Amino acid sequence: MKTVPTLSFSKLGCSRGGRQLFQNIDCVLESGHWLYVAGANGVGKTSLLRMVCGLAPIESGEIFWNGTPIHAQADAYRQDLCYLGHLNALQESMTVHENLAFTAALGGMAPDMAQTQSVLAHFGVAGRDRQLVRHLSQGQKRRVALSRLALSQARLWVLDEPFVAMDEAGVRMLADLIAAHLTQGGLAVLTSHQQVDIGAIPAQLLELRA
């Protein structure tokens, strides 16, 4: 049985080019909650998210997943994390199905064809699974990226400006997807320049200041 997931920061700090972006950040995020990382451009929001994803070194302090430093459980932590940014991060030379299967493999899962077809239909890209991503429109690519998020079994979602260039229907679709993830006991960390409404689930605010 899996433990109830918890993400925490202890005295977390980051600098860039000799300039301190943030320091002494303490935070605890528990199952069913989401963290809204706010702040002006250049204060380190993306740097913080990259540290949470393990893509940037932790300069000071520590990030814990279920009470253990993330660097001490890198493989297991990676399987429990799914990232979505303003870019879709899809392999253009692969089919939609291959992209989704690759993501499933990273999470230690085998792709479920019936579930994949159902999710693609839900996001309005049914019948596109054998199509090369390069032949999709930008809107279709974004919906494939959302499908990948929906199919993920990861308990921690890290979302960097996920609503950029999305129409109203897409924004609502993603917000509902995040809300469902939280209701099922997941966690989310996100940053956005747009107003974010995740249903009845209030944000836990972390505001970074220059």
Curated annotation (Swiss-Prot):
Where is the protein situated, by its record's location annotation? Answer: Cell inner membrane
Q: What class of enzyme is it?
A: translocase
Membrane topology label: Peripheral membrane protein
InterPro entries in UniProt: AAA+_ATPase, ABC_transporter-like_ATP-bd, ABC_transporter-like_CS, ABC_transptr_haem_export_CcmA, P-loop_NTPase
Lineage, opening ranks: Bacteria, Pseudomonadati, Pseudomonadota, Betaproteobacteria, Burkholderiales
* GO molecular-function terms, A-Z: ABC-type heme transporter activity; ATP binding; ATP hydrolysis activity
Chain ranges of the ABC transporter domain: 4-208
**Biological processes, Gene Ontology terms:** cytochrome complex assembly
Regarding protein family, the annotation reads:
Belongs to the ABC transporter superfamily. CcmA exporter (TC 3.A.1.107) family.
List positions binding ATP. Answer: 39-46
Reactions performed catalytically: heme b(in) + ATP + H2O = heme b(out) + ADP + phosphate + H(+)
Pfam families, alphabetically? ABC_tran (PF00005)
Name of the protein in its database record: Cytochrome c biogenesis ATP-binding export protein CcmA
* Free-text function comment from the UniProt entry: Part of the ABC transporter complex CcmAB involved in the biogenesis of c-type cytochromes; once thought to export heme, this seems not to be the case, but its exact role is uncertain. Responsible for energy coupling to the transport system.
Native species = Albidiferax ferrireducens (strain ATCC BAA-621 / DSM 15236 / T118) (Rhodoferax ferrireducens)
According to its UniProt record, the EC number is: 7.6.2.5
Q: Kindly report the protein's main subcellular placement as a broad class.
A: membrane
User: ATP-binding: present as a keyword of the record?
Assistant: yes
Q: Which UniProt keywords apply?
A: ATP-binding, Cell inner membrane, Cell membrane, Cytochrome c-type biogenesis, Membrane, Nucleotide-binding, Translocase, Transport
* GO CC entries: plasma membrane
